[in-house]
Each structure stands twice: as structure tokens, then as C-alpha cells.
Amino acid sequence: MIEVKDINKSFGSNHVLKGISGKFEAGVTNLIIGGSGSGKTTLLKCMIGLHRPEEGTVEYDDREFTKMNFEEKIEIRKEIGMLFQGSALFDSMTVEENIMFPLNMFTEQSTAEKRERVNFCLDRVNLESKNELFPAELSGGMKKRVGIARAIAMNPKYLFVDEPNSGLDPKTSIVIDELIKEITEEYNTTTIVVTHDMNSVMGIGDYILFLHEGKKFWEGSNKEIAHTDIQELNDFVFASRFMKAAKGKF
């Protein structure tokens, strides 16, 4: 479980996060949603240590991350897998080398052991035998799956995913969403997904934290989200044509 308590973060005079609190449980798909500028990506960066909040705490299974020293944070980061918005693959490396990168950094495994782990991860995301391809040879969906394979290479307790469906067609987006949910449940990871995609929200949102203008406006499940009387949330949820058409069916 990851818990954030009263997180405040500013950049100069811009108060981006205003007292955000929330609990993200293991084994379920946790989503942070909101419009552009709502603070969701800043919150994620505070949670993984890329930003330091002025106030508040981030706790990993009751371990207070925000007060740890550098060496202690390194140990936590070994337990974190991260899928970046653009997949962030190294163009000059093969698929195998990309997935092996965290293993090279954080383990003392033999080359054979690392290659075995790479093959396992590729098989898990249905990309077996793609080891020697380069990112330029992959489709957008395949790049995302390689990114997921790299994110789970260290068998992480915590998985962070930033806008996984950005740039993908609807069919591929569903595949990626289902893969994230399967991995979360299979390995009992604490998974946190930042997204503005309502298809993802309705498909895999076990727990949802809605941010608006840097504040937490609502939290709940995808079964509850269409039945609130919070105007800001309704404006966000029903902004898409799909959700407007589906509104009467909930």
C-alpha cells in the first residue's frame, strides 16, 4: 500500500497540489484522474521522489519515503517499476537490452539469469522472440508492452504508469489496460495509473482519485463515478461523446 497525506507542492507562486491525501491498496488498479493542469502528474512525481513536497508525507507500506536519506530511497526505488508516458525506451538499444537495463543497474545476476528474466517478461506481455528488435521497428502498442516488460523486470512491489494509452488506438488501449490489470492482480502490486482516458477509468478503475485545480474533489470506484453530484467531476466524466451516450445506461 502507498499512502499520501496532505501533500502540498508549489512551483514559485503556482500552488499545484493543495493538501492531497489518498490510500492506494495492493492488488487493485488505482487511478489518478483529472484534466490538464489538475496536478495528477505532479502528484505521481512527488510519490516517486522526482519532486519533493513542501508539506505532507508519502508512505510505502508504513515506511515514510519523504524523510528517508538517499541510500534508503534507493532501496525503495528498487521495488518500483515505472512505465513512462512515451515508453522512454532507449533507441540505440534492442528490446532485450532495454528490459535488461534495470537488472544491470540493480542486480548482480549473471547474463544467463538476466536473459531468462527478459524472456519471461516478454512472454508475459505477449512479445516473445522480439528480443533483437529496436524501438524504431515496433508499433506504438508494442513499445508500450516493452515498457511494461521493463517495468516488471525487477518484480516490483509498486508499479507507476503515466498515461499508458497516450497515442494508441482504442483497441490497443484496451489490450494495454487489461495487461496492467492482469499484472496487478497476478503479482499483487500496488499499481497507480495516471490517466485522463475515460475508457480506462470505466474498464479498470478499482479505486479512483479525482483531482481538480490541485485539490482532491472525489474518490471512489468506477461503479460509483457516474452517480455523483459533484459538478466538476461530472464535467470531466461526461466530456466525451462516449460517456454522454452511455450516461443514461448507468
Residue ranges and their predicted role:
Residues 153-157:
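A short, proline-enriched helix->beta-strand linker immediately N-terminal to the Walker B motif
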Residues 93-101:
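Short coil-to-helix segment of the ABC ATPase nucleotide-binding domain corresponding to the Q-loop/switch region
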Residues 134-138, 142:
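Conserved ABC ATPase signature
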Residues 170-172:
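Helix N-cap at the start of a conserved alpha-helix in ABC-type nucleotide-binding domains
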Residues 159-162:
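Catalytic Walker B motif of ABC-type/P-loop ATPase nucleotide-binding domains
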Residues 48:
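Helix-to-loop junction immediately C-terminal to a conserved catalytic motif
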Residues 56-64:
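Conserved ABC transporter NBD signature motif
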